């Protein structure tokens, strides 16, 4: 379960997020909708522990993200608005690299990478440099890295940005199927 209580974030005197509270139960999908500048991405960055809140609490599976950031982050797969991919790496090479950083056991890395590539339909570009991929493929590589380590929670900031209409449908169906094993919070347009 993810619990957000009275979450507030100020930048100077401007409130990006003010007294936000909600709960996402296990195996639920919560979608954030709102105009640009409404604080959606700021909220995601606080939930994932990449940005401190001004006040309030974020609890991930019983762990306060500010008190136990390392343990809480191990349970989260995060796809930021702009995927953090290394442009000079090949797709499979990058995903194996990320799996290692996430602490996936060496004997499980290849299987997890293959599974993520299959789910995101990127096997056909596994040997290509990321810099040579379209925005849609880069987005799917970013989504694949979020799945590595088999996180219980997925935080997805606009996971369908840059995808063509058919890919949007595929990714939405994938997200629905992931619900059986994951709790998902996502920003969508």
What are these regions (language model features)?
Residues 96, 100, 107-125, 176:
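Conserved ABC ATPase "signature" region
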Residues 56-67, 71-75:
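Conserved ABC transporter NBD signature motif
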